């Protein structure tokens, strides 16, 4: 009898441990105000007439672009951006970047985590990417609610480039604005430790972009955003080395403010802070006012 009780006790101890472990590994829920609080030391929040409350980083140069201070790695969710900037855990995985004619690059908060939010271009010699601006239609199409922003126009070309959701899947028609793109030689992509330093100089982008094709391939599978883009085997052939596939694991117990590396790599595991963001119809600005998003 005692042995049976002991066995039952051990069973429930193990079971409770598994439950606690699963709870510890589950994503936490936080309010979208988290972005305001944690990004304020690194940049300013301002109201935008079209996008609501937007954020702009301090201490970046006049020629800075998003997705340059870091590197690309292959993961179970496709290509993931490993940022070296202390605010990169938020701005490259949630929300979208937009180039504003008056403000420059601004970031719009979002609620869905992804390995990166970029469009991809590829040619035999080069691989490039460009930040994806917000587009309501695209997110509804793949089952993700982003926000109620209007479709965005880039006004830097003779023809306006409107981001309909079809373009994210069409490999031939969509061409991103040249000034927003970053290109790496294909033999350097996937293993160079600093994408911005290995990038092709801007004056060559027009020719490179003209000779490339769109390979953007974003999917929503099992409640996760998958960022495929450049073919993994093509990258391995060009670089002559096998890619490491990183497992993405939730990291919930983190100190955000003052941390240089919120997300960390250990072996083949990439520990990321990616809480589920709860939407709020109002978000604070730096002047402590509120306005509808």
Task: List PLM regions with ranges.
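Low-complexity segments
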Residues: 28-287
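Classical secretory targeting signals
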Residues: 1-27, 290-293
